[in-house]
């Protein structure tokens, strides 16, 4: 099993950190003592929550010093920040690749996939695990009324929306 601190020892920078999934992944890594920061094109409720959690967020572009850059598929692969990261030989990961790396750090993974109902099903699983007293980290692809988009009580299970 991989460790977060070894896998991301040079920090992680998120391009598009204000999205529902990216902000949850940023909080998850920050909770595991990984240096995290990022940027987004616009302010959102998620960027405000990240700042409240102590994660630096820039609106617009800035210099990237972290060793790993994560971007969403919504970001143009020829975007200036990604081109600069390639030139600096940084490790580039899509959100999906990062999600796979994070899942590899857990002994048990439950991933909800499909066309409709993923967020609802993932949220329901999070509630089931909470009420069953099971140690789980939950990456929810939307806003659960109780948990928001991220919830963690332990590292035995990783619940995620694929």
Across the structure, where does each feature detected by a protein language model lie?
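Phosphate-binding loop of NTP-binding sites
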Residues: 4, 28, 51, 59, ...
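Structural motif
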Residues: 11, 67-68
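ATP-dependent carboxylate-amine ligase
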Residues: 1-46, 51-56, 87-90
